[in-house]
Amino acid sequence: MGRSKRSKKKSLAHLQSDGKDKLSSEENISRGSEVEESPENFEEAQDYGDSLKDTDEQSDSITAIRSVTGGTASTITDLNNKFKSQELVDNEKVEINTKSTEEVGCKPSTDHSTEALDEGHDTGISSTNKDDSDVRIIGDDNEDSEAIESVDIKGKVSSGISDADVLKPQEELVHTAILENDNPFYDANKEISGSKKLDEKVNSVDSMAETTKVNSGDSKQRMGDLVVRRSENLHNPNLDYEEEDEILVSNTDTNKHSKESSSALNNANMKSFGNAVKSYTKKSGKHVRILEAKKVSEGQSRTFVAYFIKYNGHMVRRRYSDFESLRSILVKLFPLMVIPPIPEKEGLKSYSKAIAGLKHAKYILPSEQTDSVDLSLSIIDQSVSDKEENIIRHRVRILTKFLNRLLDNTDISSTSLIEDFLNPNNSNWNDFVTSSATFSMLPRNRLQANPVDPTNTTRVHACLPIPNTSVALGKRDPELFVSGNENDDTDGYILLEKEHKRYESIVNNTYKYNRRITKNFNEMKHDYDDLAAAFAELSNLDISSNPKHVDFCATFDKSSIAMQALVSNLYYNIDEPLNEAIYNTNAVTELLMFRKLKAVQLYKVEKSLVGKVHELQKLEKGENKIESEPNQESLTSARRLSPIPAPQKLGGSFFNKISEIANKVKESVSYQELDVETQISNLRKEIERLKETSAVTTKDMEVINDTICKEEVPKALKCGEKELEDILASYASYMKTYAKQNLEYWKSIQEAR
């Protein structure tokens, strides 16, 4: 081993001296010329290459080889070719240097060729990685030589240095790609093509054995052929990277274009996505639930009740005024639709006064719920009194159904309004509404908005007259009055309005009477409690052993419990749905009133148009008459110059002074003659404007009649009748259940006798 080191040092000194001589001899060679091969240098390089396998000073050896070769392209290429051929001829197995392979990142292999690659990394690459510097070939810059490269060690390679440098680009490409072991979708039967796949086989021998099922000898021979082929056809590996970069850039542009197309498609299909909200919420069960209601005070302002809404896994806090604002916006955005109702704005104090006459007005929640709202899931704050709890539960019920009905509505859910309302990021709903440009553009009065699209209100709609809603419209429909036929009901509005009024009367009366029954049953329940307590006290005072009083006490207790269950069902499952039905009828009435006011609006426009036309005709006739009678002007002027007769004096000095002052004022006023032509021109412009307004209003009225009278109101009436049938069926079921239980209780008393 010592001999080998001495011979290596000697050869190193000899090679360095020869290299200096060769460098001095090549100074005058022009750039791009070829250098003749030096057999002595190649023989010494081969001998020195064999000694590299038994030494650790590899960095200095590579530098010596580069100094000997002089850095020219042809010398480096031939040196590498012979150096690789000598390594392949030896075909000796050497133990793998584990430390070197860990630094480079390659997998260990028993193949001699792969060991040579690892040694190449140890000699020339790993040492330079520590300094993080660039490896540059010493010599002249030859433009015709493709082997002269100056690149960074981290991911780039200088060509023509060693066998490891020759395969470095492919190794780097392998390490950055997904290997077969890492790819779960790899097809083992697919043929491997290209140098990249062969490089993957070199770095993953186990994977190559499983997929291609070849022995180690075949892989060794294949690797040797690959090294020889690459050494013969050496080219710049950076060109491959440039081609791949171009492909990546092209793919990036394609992906960007596809993303833009996808974004445009998503915007175009936003409405269809909103239409799927209804089916999505039903399948996923992501409906709105109000989980808590409690009093909240912000700063020094008065307290209010906040409702904590859970939707899609998030919690948002809203107050009653926020719900009221949301519904007012929906009424403006969808003027031809029945918007679900919300409870009337009623203070807690006023509601408490209204129910103050009821003894024990608090009702226990029933064991069963007839609709989708489960009030048992809503927590009422303990700071709320029993009298205030009823109105809070009432609001929780109606507001929950209000939001769920909005989500189930296809047209409303196609917009982002409901999602914005339920978004916890919009903590202050009032600020969100005032900062929205869409809401600020809406007209204050929906009678001056475009009924088809309120966000696209025209100048004609903005100038429409607003009827007075406080004035009674009378028995006759204004639209029928305009048509001139009171029996004309082509749209079915009169019959529809009568049907709605009949349904509204039934619901109101049913709610009023059932509320009275519920109140009486609630009082009867407390009477049963008093009777049970009286019989219990009587049984304690009875000297005899007669247990009849005890039986009466137990029976009245059971009847009280059954009555309490009945009262709870009647209040929450009958009275509350009936009250909600009244709210629904009010929403339909509001929609019918909108249709009627639009009819009055059209009537006013038509009436104003007819009056202006008559006035224009009168002026035109008067002008023609003046032209035919020229003396008429002199008569009018003489009449104008004639003194105004003095008014008859009234009795008393006070009235005489007033008359004198009035006469002086009349004499001082000069009567200016009107320009008939200007007046006619103004009337014609006004008539044109009214005709345009009449045409737009008539067209809107047709849309309103088709939507309200033929779709919305009939659908609402049909749903209301179905709800009323379900309510009455539940009412009969509750009464029947209570009657059966109460009958069994008293039958047991009769049998005991």
UniProtKB/Swiss-Prot annotation:
Pfam families registered for this protein in UniProt: PX (PF00787)
Region (Disordered): 1-76, 95-138, 203-222
GO cellular component: cytoplasmic side of endosome membrane; cytosol; phagophore assembly site membrane
Biased composition range(s): Basic and acidic residues: 17-29, 95-122, 129-138
Biased composition (Polar residues): 60-76, 204-218
PX domain boundaries: 283-429
Biased composition (Acidic residues): 35-47
Compartments where located: Endosome membrane; Preautophagosomal structure membrane
Topology in membrane: Peripheral membrane protein
Protein keywords: Autophagy, Endosome, Lipid-binding, Membrane, Protein transport, Transport
Biased composition, class Basic residues, residue ranges: 1-12
UniProt: a 1,2-diacyl-sn-glycero-3-phospho-(1D-myo-inositol-3-phosphate) binding residues: R319, S321, K345, R395
Molecular function per GO: phosphatidylinositol-3-phosphate binding
UniProt-listed GO biological process terms: autophagy of mitochondrion; cytoplasm to vacuole targeting by the Cvt pathway; early endosome to Golgi transport; macroautophagy
Summary of the function given for this chain in its UniProt record: Required for cytoplasm to vacuole transport (Cvt), pexophagy and mitophagy. Also involved in endoplasmic reticulum-specific autophagic process and is essential for the survival of cells subjected to severe ER stress. Functions in protein retrieval from the endocytic pathway.
Family the UniProt entry places it in: Belongs to the sorting nexin family.
Domain comment (free text): The PX domain binds phosphatidylinositol 3-phosphate which is necessary for peripheral membrane localization to the perivacuolar punctate structures.
Protein name: Autophagy-related protein 20
Organism the protein comes from: Candida glabrata (strain ATCC 2001 / BCRC 20586 / JCM 3761 / NBRC 0622 / NRRL Y-65 / CBS 138)
